[in-house]
Design a protein with these regions (language model features):
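Histidine-anchored nucleotide/phosphate-binding helix
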Residues: 19-35
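Extreme N-terminal starter segment of soluble prokaryotic enzymes
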Residues: 3-7
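Solvent-exposed loop/turn segments at secondary-structure junctions
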Residues: 14-15, 47-50, 83-86
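Short helix-terminating capping/connector loops at secondary-structure junctions
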Residues: 2, 34-38
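Short, glycine-rich nucleotide/cofactor-binding loops
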Residues: 8-21, 54-55
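Short, well-structured secondary-structure segments
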Residues: 37-41, 48-51
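Short internal beta-strands
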Residues: 40-45, 78-81
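A cross-taxonomic marker for long C-terminal extensions/tails that follow the last structured domain
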Residues: 53-121
């Protein structure tokens, strides 16, 4: 019988994406080895949102490929609309596989209330 884990990874700095993605990959690997079903989310807010914009394509090509691979494994990736507004990033510029939520911190609070484990690499 599979055991269920709900995990949320939070990143708010552009330079934390690599470790956040590595943590996601490790969680998926360990879950598979331990016969766990994982509901894994990555929530980006503040300046980390900049890396999810098509405008930052040149600097984040590897990140984009990594996030697509994670999404293909069932990871949901969320971006904060409040941060987008603050940074003047239009929603049409966000990578198409990223889901926009009204508030990243509120989304995190809701998930914690629902029992998600919170990890900020």
């Amino acid at each position: 019988m599979n055991k269920m884990l709900n995990i949320l990874l939070h990143t708010d700095e552009e330079d934390r994406w690599a470790i956040t993605c590595k943590n996601a990959e490790t969680i998926l690997k360990m879950a598979e080895m331990g016969n766990y079903t994982v509901n894994l989310e990555i929530v980006a807010n503040s300046f980390a949102v900049k890396s999810l914009s098509a405008d930052s394509f040149a600097s984040t090509l590897k990140l984009k490929d990594t996030l697509i691979a994670l999404q293909d494994k069932g990871v949901n990736i969320y971006c904060c609309s409040e941060s987008m507004n603050f940074l003047e990033i239009d929603s049409s510029m966000i990578l198409p596989f990223v889901k926009v939520v009204p508030s990243g911190v509120f989304h995190i609070a809701l998930r914690q209330h629902e029992g998600f484990a919170y990890i900020k690499p």
